[in-house]
């Protein structure tokens, strides 16, 4: 489990490649953009900018600190919502995280600029942004590793090595510091135990995790996040779970599909296709080899097929919570000159917006007691694709207010809901994803079960569990 968690405070060189592979092509930046966004914001400047945005848009933003770095720098989140600080049932929560590796700060700057764009759009009554903010709660953590960033920023570019500032100040790679839930998932598969989600309760080790990991881990567990993205550098590709190889030798690379492989591929492809270059054959592979020519495979990759990572954040999200997270590699070059940042914004702006909109795909709804109308928390929601005979081996659970969310591509599905003390309920639906600001709403009112389940009900439950267990 995540040890010593504190409560969330809510209130080196690469092979030569063509320049456009990591610099971007955009030519629409203005002199004002270059002055404002053509440099990296240090910690003090970042905090000041977030404060400025909050003051400019107080009705739709709130600032909160989820913890501190080893050296005491605050991990500050800015939330955008029509009800900042309050979760509204069936309104999806999205989080975006930058600068997990201190020497990979493009995401830090993109997220800071995304925050300002949301604020300015709301002020100017931009139709798309107003629609997005009316329907979505967006949490932005520009920097998860401010200590590493300050180290990298304070090192002369000529002296900066490939790993300078990557880890936190204790020398720990934060993307290897989360509980390794993949190993638990693979072991449960091997022995045939039908447990596929929320695996943190089964995890135990004696590792003293880093304060940045603890803060983000606790934050991830504190809200019903639906969708998440983690911004990195070192290549140009959208990476999706699983990150840890299913092979017993965790160092071996092998395609390791999650139960939601199709959905994750769809999410990653959405980002890559909306990016100026990620999915296009207009740039050389970052490492100069055909093996990692990601553009030829649509600008996406399964994490473990690329290289195996145990203790990564995106798999933690998937196996500990209801959230789906992908990792976005934005540049071959790490920490490029600040003057190039406006071009990166041009390359990624559409992708970021379209990715957040994906939180409104699939289905969502409420699960309540049919007799009292009271919400049922921790109800288990299974999804069966219409082309499959058994459910996806990864259910989601309802939040404390009875709401659930399931990101899905268009298709026909059966939704099966089970809760202790209630009869199982199921509905068949067609997901079209044609409504931009809302997933398909599918509500359930569960009837209380008899004191002793009938033989038929027991058989139904046993059959459902056995079918899921057999799908290995």
Curated annotation (Swiss-Prot):
Tissue: Expression is restricted to the nervous system.
The protein's enzyme class: hydrolase
Residues of the active site: 329 (proton donor/acceptor)
Cofactor: Zn(2+)
SMART domains with a match to the protein in the record: Zn_pept (SM00631)
Major localisation: other
Source taxon at top rank: Eukaryota
Occurrences of domain Peptidase M14 (ranges): 39-359
Catalytic reaction list: Release of C-terminal arginine or lysine residues from polypeptides
GO function term, MF aspect, one: metallocarboxypeptidase activity
Glycan-bearing residues: 134, 385, 428
Subcellular location: Cell projection, Axon; Perikaryon; Cytoplasmic vesicle, Secretory vesicle lumen
GO cellular component labels: axon; cytoplasmic vesicle; extracellular space; neuronal cell body; perikaryon; presynapse
Signal sequence annotation: 1-21
Keywords: Carboxypeptidase, Cell projection, Cytoplasmic vesicle, Glycoprotein, Hydrolase, Metal-binding, Metalloprotease, Protease, Signal, Zinc
Chain positions recorded as Zn(2+) binding sites: 101, 104, 232
Enzyme Commission code: 3.4.17.10
Known role: During FMRFamide-like peptide (FaRPs or FLP) and neuropeptide-like protein (NLP) precursor processing, catalyzes the removal of Arg or Lys residues from the C-terminus following the initial endoprotease cleavage. By processing neuropeptides, modulates basal acetylcholine release at the ventral cord neuromuscular junctions. Involved in egg-laying, defecation and locomotion. By processing FLP neuropeptides, regulates the turning step of male mating behavior. Involved in reducing pharyngeal pumping in response to high CO(2) levels.
Family indicated by similarity: Belongs to the peptidase M14 family.
Protein name (record): Carboxypeptidase E
Gene name for this UniProt entry: egl-21
